[in-house]
């Protein structure tokens, strides 16, 4: 099964015909959404329960994990330990997990998260924390894809039942992360299409959020990506 979804549910006026859409309205058009609300702060359990109730049974969420979990937030300001942080996050997400509307928790690491023994050990901690829950890992440092590491990295992802996110993003000379279609978890595959706007990807001004993924794929690019999606769909359940 192939599910198509967008990032956030409220900002797609061309989809719903409204400037600000509700999750209920979005869910009448697409069967999946990626949400990053929890990345900026763990939401109340009641709020997550409201999201779950707003969508039909066959709807699924890709939920980006709290920034502290992906080594990008100052979790020490709010939690006494990593275990307390994880407990708070999983408690918040309980309605999503129990409803079986979770497609995957997305752990999106930054470009500084390189292929080191320490970071491999941290990935093992993530699997331990989340037990058998579906986890999609996005690696934004090209050291993981170097010829002397990539085979071991893919095997590690398989052994830990991680779904390595297949990413299409701008190829920055200093840190080119390749489009690498490969199934590491036959239960689910997650593609993310960030566009190919190199200048926007590197923007660091006040408008960087609007520029980062500002890109219009042409017909041939869409055809090429669609072919990859179809091929991977034959190797995974979803």
Walk through the language-model features, giving the residues of each.
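Residues lining hydrophobic/aromatic ligand-binding pockets adjacent to catalytic sites
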Residues: 1-238
């Amino acid at each position: 099964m192939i599910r198509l979804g967008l990032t956030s549910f409220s900002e797609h006026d061309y989809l719903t015909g409204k400037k600000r859409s509700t999750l209920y309205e979005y869910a009448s058009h697409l069967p999946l959404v990626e949400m990053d609300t929890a990345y900026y702060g763990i939401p109340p359990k009641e709020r997550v329960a409201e999201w779950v109730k707003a969508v039909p049974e066959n709807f699924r969420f890709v939920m980006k994990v709290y920034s502290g979990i992906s080594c990008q937030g100052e979790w020490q300001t709010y939690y006494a330990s990593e275990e307390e942080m994880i407990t708070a996050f999983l408690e918040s997400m309980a309605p999503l997990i129990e409803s079986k509307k979770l497609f995957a928790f997305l752990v999106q690491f930054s470009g500084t998260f390189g292929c080191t023994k320490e970071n491999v050990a941290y990935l093992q901690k993530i699997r331990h924390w989340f037990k058998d829950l579906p986890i999609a890992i996005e690696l934004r440092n090209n050291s993981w894809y170097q010829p002397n590491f990539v085979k071991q990295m893919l095997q590690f992802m398989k052994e830990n039942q991680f779904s390595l996110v297949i990413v299409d993003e701008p190829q920055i000379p200093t840190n080119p992360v390749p489009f690498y279609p490969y199934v590491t978890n036959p239960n689910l595959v997650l593609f993310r299409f960030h566009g190919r706007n190199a200048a926007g990807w590197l923007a660091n001004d006040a408008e960087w959020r609007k520029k980062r993924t500002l890109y219009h794929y042409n017909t041939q690019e869409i055809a090429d990506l669609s072919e990859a999606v179809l091929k991977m769909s034959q190797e995974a359940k979803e």
